[in-house]
């Protein structure tokens, strides 16, 4: 009798995805982040569901309801901080996942890569609307500043902003719709993640060498299930350590002050995972230019497959490209740091230089280095 996992219509899908999936034998721990992102998503949906049971999306009670969750709900404080810090873990895994794809040339899987970019945008939208929900000072002013950027769009800008606000300022209507968006978007992310996986399994995984590994595949289970379990345990341990010892480490103290439209915080800044894009936005003294640069800071990923000039797929054997890649990582971290600093000298100048370098590395220097490497190898 044939094994049920290979014949049953539903179990067969799970089998072909997580059990009998042929996987390259040499993929490193950098390939763990895909499954970790899946784990983060499940954790966020579950903690979010329990938070939604006690949260009220109304300007008069939103802040109080979050306080109520922390003080009066059984383990409410734990659920709330797991959810808040879970977002940070999500983005850490996400940036590592994208970084790995850039380093090893996984972006040549065109469909998988494009769905990934769509996932990144959806995730950023989810995190942004979620940050507005506690209705603290930074929630309110963050929502005001970021939604206001749309007014830079010629002709329809102002109408668009008022349409998103549901009035003439960020108010009750805005909070209610942001809660609705924050509830629905994770399920859209889940759907996109399944499509992402579907496209990946059409081609099979890449590996550190970038060379096709059809001749050397091993089953996903038990080899990579055990490897992913280790990654998952490290993620859970890190998440719990952060939540139980320093729950407010990555948050903003201003968000413990209820939203007040009459009092602007000294430094309006988003959560740490958006600071790099925020630094790029602030580097350009023109509103529309800043918005376009902000959009392009993520959208530039879509051009990377077209800018792949190397004859090799991975950066494993390309020292010049490796050097530029780590420069990009350092630049990303510099932008993140500058995004959290006040708009004054020397941060403004540093931010502008780091922003120019960011686009220069991706669009010019890396493709040029690849061509030089080809030349040196007489290819």
Swiss-Prot record:
Pfam families according to UniProt: Cytochrom_B_C (PF00032), Cytochrome_B (PF00033)
Quaternary assembly: The cytochrome bc1 complex contains 11 subunits: 3 respiratory subunits (MT-CYB, CYC1 and UQCRFS1), 2 core proteins (UQCRC1 and UQCRC2) and 6 low-molecular weight proteins (UQCRH/QCR6, UQCRB/QCR7, UQCRQ/QCR8, UQCR10/QCR9, UQCR11/QCR10 and a cleavage product of UQCRFS1). This cytochrome bc1 complex then forms a dimer.
GO annotation (BP), single: mitochondrial electron transport, ubiquinol to cytochrome c
Membrane topology listed for this record: Multi-pass membrane protein
Residues involved in heme b b566 binding: 97, 196
Role description: Component of the ubiquinol-cytochrome c reductase complex (complex III or cytochrome b-c1 complex) that is part of the mitochondrial respiratory chain. The b-c1 complex mediates electron transfer from ubiquinol to cytochrome c. Contributes to the generation of a proton gradient across the mitochondrial membrane that is then used for ATP synthesis.
Gene: MT-CYB
Entry keyword Transport: yes
Miscellaneous comment text of the record: Heme 1 (or BL or b562) is low-potential and absorbs at about 562 nm, and heme 2 (or BH or b566) is high-potential and absorbs at about 566 nm.
Matching InterPro entries: Cyt_b/b6_C, Cyt_b/b6_C_sf, Cyt_b/b6_N, Cytb/b6-like_sf, Cytochrome_b, Cytochrome_b_C_euk/bac, Cytochrome_b_N_euk/bac, Di-haem_cyt_TM
Cofactor: heme b
Cofactor mode of binding and number, as noted: Binds 2 heme b groups non-covalently.
Binding site for a ubiquinone: 201
Keywords, sorted A to Z: Electron transport, Heme, Iron, Membrane, Metal-binding, Mitochondrion, Mitochondrion inner membrane, Respiratory chain, Transmembrane, Transmembrane helix, Transport, Ubiquinone
Localization (cell): Mitochondrion inner membrane
Biological classification of the source: Eukaryota, Metazoa, Chordata, Craniata, Vertebrata
GO cellular component: mitochondrial inner membrane; respiratory chain complex III
Family membership: Belongs to the cytochrome b family.
Molecular-function annotations in GO: metal ion binding; ubiquinol-cytochrome-c reductase activity
Gene3D superfamilies the record matches: Cytochrome Bc1 Complex, Chain C
Residues annotated as binding heme b b562: 83, 182
Transmembrane segments: 33-53, 77-98, 113-133, 178-198, 226-246, 288-308, 320-340, 347-367
Record PROSITE patterns: CYTB_CTER, CYTB_NTER
Official protein name in the record: Cytochrome b
């Amino acid at each position: 009798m044939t094994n049920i996992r290979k014949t049953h219509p539903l179990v067969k899908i799970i089998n072909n995805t997580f059990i009998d999936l042929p996987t390259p034998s040499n993929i490193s721990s950098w390939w763990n982040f895909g499954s970790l992102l899946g784990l983060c998503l499940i954790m966020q949906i579950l903690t979010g569901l329990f938070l939604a049971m006690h949260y009220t999306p109304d300007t008069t009670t939103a802040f109080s309801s979050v306080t109520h969750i922390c003080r009066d709900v059984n383990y409410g404080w734990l659920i709330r901080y797991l959810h808040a810090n879970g977002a940070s873990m999500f983005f850490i895994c996400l940036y590592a996942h994208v970084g790995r794809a850039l380093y090893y040339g996984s972006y040549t899987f065109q469909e998988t890569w494009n769905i990934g970019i769509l996932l990144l945008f959806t995730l950023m939208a989810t995190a942004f609307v979620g940050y507005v929900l506690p209705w603290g000072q930074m929630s309110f002013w963050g929502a005001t500043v970021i939604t206001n950027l749309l007014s830079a769009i010629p002709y329809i800008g102002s109408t668009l902003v008022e349409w998103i606000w549901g009035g003439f300022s960020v108010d009750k209507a805005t909070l209610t719709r942001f809660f609705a968006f924050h509830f629905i978007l994770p399920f859209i992310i889940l759907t996109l993640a399944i499509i992402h996986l579907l496209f990946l399994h059409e081609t099979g995984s890449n590996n550190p060498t970038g060379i096709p590994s059809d001749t050397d595949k091993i089953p996903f289970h038990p080899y990579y299930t055990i490897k992913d379990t280790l990654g998952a345990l490290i993620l859970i341990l890190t998440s719990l350590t952060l939540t139980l010892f320093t729950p407010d480490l990555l948050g903003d103290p201003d968000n413990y002050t209820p939203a007040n439209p009459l009092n602007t915080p000294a430094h309006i800044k988003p959560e740490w995972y958006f600071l790099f894009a925020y630094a790029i936005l602030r580097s350009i003294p023109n509103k529309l230019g800043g918005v376009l640069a902000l959009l392009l800071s993520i959208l530039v990923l879509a051009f990377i497959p077209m800018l792949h000039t190397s004859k090799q797929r991975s950066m494993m054997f390309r020292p010049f490209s490796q050097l530029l890649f780590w420069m990009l990582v350092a630049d990303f971290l510099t932008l993140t740091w500058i995004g959290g600093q006040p708009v004054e000298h020397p941060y403004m100048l540093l931010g502008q230089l780091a922003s120019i370098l960011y686009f220069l590395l991706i669009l010019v220097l890396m493709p040029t280095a690849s061509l030089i490497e080809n030349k040196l190898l007489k290819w």
